[in-house]
């Protein structure tokens, strides 16, 4: 979707991945729906030049500024209408696969299981032949690490290069003019920590080198966990609030 997002580099990256998959022998039809005129009316840091993209941990309260009102309801509605059109035209059943995941549950209500259950029921009630359509949400209870581990298996099975596939993606909400990820938005931090968890360097380009953005993300995670426990002045080692452990003690913001 083109909806006036500041990170519309994701559209170019998607085209690059489609081209790569095509070169590997996979036939994929790619369509872009332009919603920029309508959604320019919405209030969100993702679409408004008057609002800054917040930085820090992806579950911090200020990340709510990145919510686009009713976005996934709009996206899902268009997808459902298109899927139903394909089902009727081709006389087949259609699954709508979405990558919503548990890492978004805290900040984005329209990524939660109950939202998709409710909106699926509404679409069923509001359409003829709705039995032909279903939602496939494989990561609704998983996080970005789950997605990456699954992607490693899928790329191997499909004979695809994992690094090429993920170099052709964008997660950052505030990439620079060259399309390089900032490493500072909540979405960046979540992605960086997921790659760290699987022991791989993120192939996407950042404004800083990988070691720097990784350390920044780990620091953001640490700050979040310490402050969440009301321990802003509590000494800690490297295990969040486990102050009884041996190690180097320091202030979280020093």
Where are these regions (language model features)?
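AMP-forming adenylation/ATP pyrophosphatase catalytic core
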Residues: 101, 208-214
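Short, flexible, mixed-charge glycine/proline-rich loop motifs
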Residues: 162-166, 174-180, 239-247
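Short, surface-exposed acidic
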Residues: 27-29, 158-169, 219-227
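A charge-rich, low-complexity, intrinsically flexible signal that marks solvent-exposed coils, linkers
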Residues: 218-253
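ATP-dependent adenylation/nucleotidyltransferase module used to activate substrates
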Residues: 1-162, 188
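Iron-sulfur (Fe-S) cluster-binding segments and ferredoxin-like electron-carrier domains
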Residues: 179-210
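Short cysteine-rich clusters marking metal-coordination/redox-active sites
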Residues: 172, 182-185, 251
């Amino acid at each position: 979707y083109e909806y006036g997002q500041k990170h519309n580099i994701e559209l170019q990256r998607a085209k690059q991945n489609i081209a790569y998959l095509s070169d590997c022998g996979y036939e994929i039809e790619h369509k872009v729906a332009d919603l920029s005129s309508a959604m320019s009316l919405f209030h969100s840091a993702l679409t408004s030049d008057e609002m800054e993209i917040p930085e820090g941990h992806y579950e911090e309260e200020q990340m709510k500024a990145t919510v686009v009102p009713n976005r996934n309801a709009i996206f899902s509605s268009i997808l459902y209408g298109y899927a139903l059109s394909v089902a009727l035209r081709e006389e087949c059943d259609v699954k709508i696969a979405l990558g919503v995941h548990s890492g978004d549950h805290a900040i984005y209500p329209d990524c939660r299981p109950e939202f998709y259950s409710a909106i699926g029921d509404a679409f069923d009630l509001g359409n003829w032949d709705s039995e032909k359509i279903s939602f496939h949400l494989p990561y609704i209870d998983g996080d970005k690490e789950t997605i990456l581990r699954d992607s490693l298996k899928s790329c191997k099975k499909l004979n695809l290069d994992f690094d090429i596939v993920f170099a052709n993606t964008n997660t950052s909400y505030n990439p620079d003019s060259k399309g390089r990820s900032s490493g500072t938005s909540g979405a960046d931090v979540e992605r960086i920590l997921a790659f760290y968890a699987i022991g791989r360097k993120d192939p996407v380009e950042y404004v800083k080198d990988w070691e720097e953005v990784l350390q920044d993300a780990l620091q953001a995670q640490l700050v979040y966990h310490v402050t969440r426990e009301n321990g802003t002045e509590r000494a800690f080692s490297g295990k969040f609030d486990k102050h009884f452990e041996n190690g180097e003690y320091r202030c979280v913001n020093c």
